[in-house]
Regions:
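Hydrophobic alpha-helical and helix-loop surface patches within well-folded domains
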Residues: 1-121
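Short acidic/polar inter-strand loop motif in beta-rich domains
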Residues: 178-190
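Extracellular cysteine-rich microdomains
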Residues: 146, 190-191
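Composition- and surface-driven signal marking solvent-exposed, interaction-prone regions
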Residues: 58-62, 132-136, 154, 188-190
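Residue-level marker of positions within ordered structural domains that often coincide
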Residues: 49, 98, 124, 145, ...
C-alpha cells in the first residue's frame, strides 16, 4: 500500500528526527526526504487517525488561515493544532517530532471465559537514541469466528501494559495497525 511504502522508507534507518536544530541547518538535512518529508508527513497521518477526519481537517484549515502568507515553526503547528482540537500533544511531539526512531511492538492477546479480550503490549525502540517509550494510541481489529469485527483503541502509556476490554463474540484473529495508522516496523501479535 501507499502508506506501507512510507513506513518502509522511514524505518529503513533506525534513527533521525523530523526536527532540524539550528546546528543542523544544512540543505541536505533540511530537505531530507526520509525525515523531513516522509516521517514528517507520517506524523500528520498519525494525528489524523488520533483525532478523526473532521477534527483533523478543521485543525489544518485553522492552521492554514492563521499562518497564511507567513512562516511557522513545528511548535506553531503544535499550538494551533492543540487550540483547534482541545487536546495536548506535548508527549506526541516530544516522541515523534523531536525524538529519534520509532517503536517496535509485541502484542499478546487472549480471550477470557466471559468473552472479554485481554492484551499485553510491549515495545522496544529502534535505536538507543530514541525516546525511552512512545506513548501512543494503538489500533486493534478483532475478527470473530462468524466474521464479526470490532475496532478497538488501546491507550498505551507504559511498557508491558495490560488491557482487558469487553467483546460480544468469539475472537478468531486480531490485527494490529491494520490500516497503517501508526509508524512502527515489523510488529508481532500472538495469541
Amino acid at each position: 500500500s501507499y502508506l506501507q511504502g512510507f513506513i518502509d522508507n522511514i524505518t529503513g534507518t533506525a534513527g533521525g528526527t523530523v526536527y532540524v536544530p539550528e546546528s543542523g541547518l544544512e540543505s541536505f538535512r533540511i530537505f531530507d526526504s526520509r525525515l523531513s518529508y516522509n516521517k514528517g508527513s507520517y506524523l500528520l497521518v498519525m494525528l489524523k487517525w488520533m483525532v478523526g477526519d473532521d477534527n483533523f481537517y478543521q485543525a489544518i484549515r485553522n492552521y492554514s488561515n492563521q499562518y497564511a502568507y507567513n512562516y511557522a515553526t513545528g511548535m506553531d503547528f503544535k499550538s494551533s493544532f492543540e487550540a483547534s482540537t482541545g487536546k495536548d500533544f506535548t508527549e506526541f511531539f516530544n516522541d515523534w517530532y523531536f525524538g529519534e526512531g520509532y517503536p517496535i511492538y509485541n502484542i499478546k492477546w487472549k480471550q477470557n471465559s466471559d468473552q472479554s479480550i485481554s492484551f499485553k503490549v510491549s515495545q522496544t525502540r529502534s535505536t538507543t537514541s530514541a525516546p525511552a517509550f512512545f506513548e501512543m494510541l494503538l489500533p486493534i481489529k478483532v475478527t470473530g469466528t462468524s466474521g464479526q469485527t470490532a475496532e478497538l483503541v488501546l491507550n498505551n502509556t507504559t511498557n508491558d501494559q495490560f488491557f482487558t476490554l469487553p467483546l460480544s463474540f468469539e475472537a478468531s484473529s486480531v490485527s494490529f495497525n491494520y490500516e497503517n495508522q501508526i509508524l512502527t516496523k515489523n510488529p508481532t501479535i500472538t495469541n
